[in-house]
Amino acid sequence: DSELEGSVRRMATLLVSGAKITSPHVAIFLRKGYGLGAQAMVGGSFHDPIYTASWPTGEFGGMGLEGAVKLGFRKELEAETDPKKKEDLYNKLVERSYEKGKAIEAAAHLEIDAVIDPSDTRKVILAAVKGF
């Protein structure tokens, strides 16, 4: 549906606008950062803002994780003929994707700078801007 509605075209406008930002910016993810939407909000790269952090509730991925599993593991899922085993495999793969997409994992792999306590958000933003 989103392809028929031209979502990517509209999202490209956000990407271009974000990439043209010349002032320093800080990105704080409260919940989910998936696909082009996340990229648009950080100027095209998680490394473009002067500081990128997430609350512990943050989730990250190149696209929605359920869809990513269906596309990325299509052969494995189609090869399983037993419906119950197929569902179990799918659920296991989705769970693994959620584990890999947690904010703490993104920070551990240097995709973001830190996972912060939500109550420290204002202090973290001010420190990042002052440090610029």
PLM segments and residue spans:
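Ligand-binding clefts of soluble mixed alpha/beta catalytic domains
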Residues: 1-132
